[in-house]
Structure formats: structure tokens, C-alpha cells
């Protein structure tokens, strides 16, 4: 038996983890837009545009409707990076898993909020989305975003163009990764719209379930490596 160790990437960057993160990201965005007052949880460019429109119309109450989620999104990025810097040497849990646990907790609480609390609900969902986009920035070594599509679309088309010009199989594979993530995001949004019809405010809990799967998947690499080390130790004795 060959005991040579193979180099493995982080499970937090594996496509299967990104798959559930992207499904969750699409669901979060449709949840706040359709159920929480036409606010985007992830697409802050859209929120800035709508905020500017209402500001120039003198509708200051509506400005606040978009400004608060924007501010909480910024705070979410700050919080995720702070956790990265302070908790990156943890042994039992990866710091990214702690971020996912924080996301799950916040989104679970949002499921109890009535629509009169939409401002706070949107703030918490935006905070959670920002933590996710700051924490999970690569899939199989490629830069990506699990909560928005414009960067993925640009990178996907860039890689596709590279393949058309050079017939480089790696470029085509890279393009497939990006378009796969975009399709999963769209699928999450579509499924989210269906769960809203069935569950209302509690539809966000389906996002919690998807994040929980991602959390569990991040244990997988550690388990595999421990098994490999045990096998190698056994071979050494013989």
C-alpha cells in the first residue's frame, strides 16, 4: 500500500461546501426582497441605487429602509475579518465554522420576527450575508462569491473566453465552476420563493439548514486526514 500523503485543499473551499452556501445565499436574497420590504440582503449595489432614488424624492423613511442594511453589511464584513484574525488558530473548530454558526443563530432568530420588524430582520440578514461573503472567498482555489453573482459571471465569461481562444481545458473547468455557482444561487432563490408561500417568515430556516450542511462538511477533511494518518502509522509498524 502506498503511504505517500496527497496534498488536499481546505474543505471550506470545496465545491460541495460552496454549493450549499450558494443555495443559502440565493434564498437569503429572495427572502428579504419578497418578504421583508423589497430590500436586498446581498446585492448592496441595488440597495444603494434604491436608497439614492428615495433620497432624491425626499422619502427619508425609505432611505433608512436601505441605509440600515447597508451599514449592517459593512459591520458584518468587519466582524468576519475580526473573527478570522482572532480565532484562526483554534484547534477543535475552524474559524469559518464559527462564522457559519453565528449566521445560523442570527437567521434562526429572524424567523421569529413579524413583518413590523422588517428593518431589524433585514439588518441581521445583511450582517449574516456579509460574514459569509467575507469568509468564503474561494472554491477549489478560484476566487468566488456565494451571495452575489456579478463577480462570478465576469470570471465565468473571462474563463470561457480564454478557453475559446486557447482551448485550455483548465479554463473551461474554471468557467464551469462559476456558472455552476450562479445556477445554484438562482436555484436557491427559486426554492426560497416556494418556501415563502408555505412558511412565511420562517422560510429563512431553510437557509439555516443549508448552512448547517456546510458546517458539517467542513469536518470531513479532518476526519479523512486522521484516517490516513492512522493507516500510515499501521503500515510503519509492519
Segments from the language model and where they lie:
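Cytoplasmic-side transmembrane-helix entry/capping segments in multi-pass membrane proteins
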Residues: 92-101, 121-124, 145-149
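Small-residue-rich hydrophobic segments that form or flank transmembrane alpha-helices
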Residues: 14-62, 132-173
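Hydrophobic/small/kink-forming positions within alpha-helical transmembrane segments
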Residues: 74-78, 182-190
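Helix-to-loop junctions at the C-terminal end of transmembrane segments
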Residues: 78-91, 191, 196-197
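Central cavity-lining transmembrane alpha-helices of secondary-active solute carriers
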Residues: 67-82
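Short, Lys/Arg-rich, polar N-terminal cytosolic tail immediately upstream
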Residues: 1-12
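Symmetry-related core transmembrane helices of the 12-TM Major Facilitator Superfamily/SLC fold
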Residues: 98-105, 202-219
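C-terminal ends and interior cores of transmembrane alpha-helices
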Residues: 104-117, 218-222
Amino acid at each position: 500500500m502506498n503511504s505517500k500523503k496527497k496534498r488536499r485543499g481546505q474543505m471550506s473551499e470545496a465545491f460541495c461546501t460552496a454549493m450549499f452556501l450558494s443555495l443559502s445565499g440565493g434564498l437569503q436574497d429572495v427572502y428579504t426582497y419578497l418578504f421583508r420590504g423589497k430590500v436586498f440582503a446581498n446585492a448592496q449595489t441595488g440597495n444603494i441605487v434604491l436608497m439614492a432614488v428615495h433620497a432624491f424624492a425626499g422619502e427619508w423613511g425609505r432611505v433608512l429602509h436601505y441605509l440600515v442594511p447597508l451599514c449592517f453589511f459593512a459591520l458584518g464584513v468587519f466582524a468576519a475579518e475580526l473573527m478570522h484574525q482572532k480565532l484562526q488558530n483554534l484547534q477543535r473548530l475552524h474559524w469559518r465554522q464559527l462564522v457559519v454558526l453565528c449566521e445560523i443563530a442570527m437567521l434562526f432568530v429572524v424567523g421569529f420576527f413579524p413583518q413590523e420588524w422588517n428593518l431589524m430582520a433585514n439588518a441581521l440578514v445583511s450582517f449574516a450575508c456579509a460574514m459569509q461573503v467575507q469568509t468564503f472567498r474561494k472554491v477549489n482555489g478560484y476566487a468566488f462569491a456565494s451571495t452575489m453573482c456579478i463577480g462570478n459571471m465576469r470570471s465565468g465569461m473571462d474563463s470561457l473566453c480564454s478557453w475559446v481562444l486557447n482551448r485550455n481545458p483548465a479554463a473551461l473547468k474554471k468557467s464551469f465552476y462559476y456558472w455552476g455557482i450562479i445556477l445554484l444561487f438562482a436555484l436557491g432563490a427559486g426554492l426560497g420563493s416556494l418556501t415563502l408561500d408555505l412558511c412565511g417568515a420562517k422560510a429563512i430556516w431553510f437557509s439555516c439548514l443549508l448552512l448547517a450542511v456546510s458546517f458539517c462538511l467542513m469536518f470531513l477533511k479532518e476526519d479523512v486526514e486522521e484516517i490516513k494518518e492512522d493507516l500510515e502509522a499501521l503500515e510503519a509498524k509492519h
